[in-house]
Curated annotation (Swiss-Prot):
CDD domains: SIS_Etherase. This is N-acetylmuramic acid 6-phosphate etherase. It is an enzyme of class 4 (lyase). Specifically catalyzes the cleavage of the D-lactyl ether substituent of MurNAc 6-phosphate, producing GlcNAc 6-phosphate and D-lactate. InterPro entries: Etherase_MurQ, Glucokinase_regulatory_CS, MURQ/GCKR, SIS_dom, SIS_dom_sf. A lyase-type mechanism (elimination/hydration) is suggested for the cleavage of the lactyl ether bond of MurNAc 6-phosphate, with the formation of an alpha,beta-unsaturated aldehyde intermediate with (E)-stereochemistry, followed by the syn addition of water to give product. Its EC number is 4.2.1.126. Homodimer. Pfam families: GKRP_SIS_N (PF22645). Transmembrane segments: none annotated. The lineage of its organism: Bacteria, Bacillati, Bacillota, Bacilli, Bacillales. It comes from the Bacteria.
Length: 294
């Protein structure tokens, strides 16, 4: 029942929200937002287990699949679509599904989140299998679409995890690993796009970033698998080579082109003074880890 969910409770500090000045509203929001990172901190051990599971999927050429409805679904898609430009993944490695399909990203699809079978259809469409990890996201922790997706994932043998913002969440019953971030009452009662949404975004940032580091997508703290899809990213790629190797910008630009715009290969070529083909071979043997290739 909704009344039992902490995310649906009224916030005692904001009973007079409609009488506050603009500055007071903003200060109240900021004060509440400060509690979110602390709530996430309490779940670090559970998030670590999720990351370990996702890394295992990636190592077995499996995928990370987010499922959610409304804000939760949008946040999953947002995290998924940032992975290709940031980490050089293909668009299948991390995917997000939202109840009602992609059209629901910009406009609510009535009743979609209440249908478990829609998640079945979405996950069947990508051939979900035992190598994959499915993460169900629901602030309330009770969304039928998410529950349906987790049930289906369990049936096909995929790994499962859940992210909710209520303790003892319903979706936790259907996932092997549960992240329950207790964000509490929102300043605007029941508006879980606020603190709950912020918490979910923080957790998703952690999962995707730490998992990508775990499969060699990062050297030191540099995103060496960045895809140069625009001028800004081309410049960033050259700067990454400068930072990683200590060479001048001009030398970095030269090796960037010699390496066919492969930042990892360029770094290995500079530091080991080898040819492009040899750099690729070393990276292959090191399973993509620059540090091991060196």
């Amino acid at each position: 029942m909704l009344e039992n969910l902490s995310t649906e409770h009224r916030n005692e500090k904001t009973m007079n929200l409609d009488e506050m000045s603009i500055k007071e509203i903003l200060q109240s929001m900021n004060e509440e937002d400060r509690t979110v990172a602390l709530a996430v901190e309490n779940e670090i051990e559970q998030i670590e287990k999720v990351v370990q599971t996702v890394i295992k999927s990636f190592e077995e050429e499996g995928r990370l699949i987010y499922i959610g409805a409304g804000t939760s679904g949008r946040l999953g898609i947002l995290d998924a679509v940032e992975c290709p430009p940031t980490f050089g993944t293909d668009d299948k490695m991390v995917q997000g599904f939202i109840a009602g399909g992609l059209k629901a990203f910009t406009k609510a699809v009535e009743g979609a989140e209440d249908r478990e079978e829609l998640a079945d259809e979405d996950l069947k469409s990508i051939g979900l299998n035992e190598k994959d990890t499915v993460i169900g996201i629901a602030a309330s922790g009770r969304t039928p679409y998410v529950i349906g997706g987790l049930k289906y994932a369990n049936r096909v043998g995929a790994s499962t995890a859940s992210i909710s913002c209520n303790k003892n969440a319903e979706i936790s019953k259907y996932a092997k690993i549960n992240v329950e971030v207790g964000t509490g009452a929102e300043i605007l009662t029941g508006s879980t796009r606020l603190k709950a949404g912020t918490a979910q975004k923080l957790v998703l940032n952690m999962i995707s970033t730490a998992s990508m580091i775990g499969v060699g997508k990062v050297y030191k703290n540099l995103m060496v698998d960045v895809q140069s899809t625009n001028e800004k990213l081309v410049e960033r790629s050259k700067r990454i080579i400068v930072e990683a190797t200590g060479v001048s910008y001009e030398v970095a630009a030269e090796y960037y082109e010699k390496a066919e715009r492969n930042v990892k290969a360029a770094i290995v070529m500079v530091l080991l003074q080898c040819e492009y083909g040899e750099a690729l071979q070393k990276l292959k043997e090191a399973k993509g880890f620059v540090k091991k290739a060196l």
